[in-house]
């Protein structure tokens, strides 16, 4: 049994960095920078993002994934033999970030939401490829 742990703090930090980058790139920095936020709303978005990741992995790995949220931490337990676990964790974290960023941009800069949704779609496909590939037993 292998476990992937994705932390809210890591994802939220990435969302803040990404919003600052996008804001600077498209000259809407003050509009999209994540300074004031509702913690309960952010945790709900994080739960939605991780549920999205869980659905992708559950469908591909055909195994039950237990997802639990304890003090801002999502733990997914994967009962599968897969040698890409670190890459899967990294991609899952980035996918959760893209999902939350898209939700943030819908509120702050709807004209830029397509950028985040495209990133989310690409990361979903990458996660599918990583989860699907398993090294053959020798």
Predicted features along the sequence, with ranges:
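Charged, low-complexity interaction regions
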Residues: 104, 108-113
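Short, solvent-exposed helix-helix connector turns and helix-capping sites enriched
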Residues: 109, 117-120
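Elongated alpha-helical scaffolds
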Residues: 91-103
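Conserved short "hinge" loops at termini or chain/domain junctions
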Residues: 1-85, 115, 122-138
């Amino acid at each position: 049994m292998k476990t992937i742990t994705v932390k809210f703090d890591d994802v939220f930090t990435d969302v803040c960095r990404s919003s600052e980058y996008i804001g600077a790139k498209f000259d809407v920095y003050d509009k999209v920078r994540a300074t004031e936020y509702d913690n309960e709303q952010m945790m709900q978005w994080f739960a939605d993002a991780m549920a999205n990741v869980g659905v992708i992995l559950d469908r591909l790995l055909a195994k039950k994934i237990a997802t639990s949220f304890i003090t801002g931490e999502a733990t997914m337990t994967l009962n599968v033999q897969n040698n890409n676990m670190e890459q899967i964790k990294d991609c899952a974290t980035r996918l959760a970030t893209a999902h939350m960023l898209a939700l943030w941009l819908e509120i702050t800069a709807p004209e830029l939401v397509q950028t985040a949704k495209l990133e989310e779609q690409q990361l979903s496909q990458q996660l599918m490829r990583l989860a699907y590939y398993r090294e053959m037993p020798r």
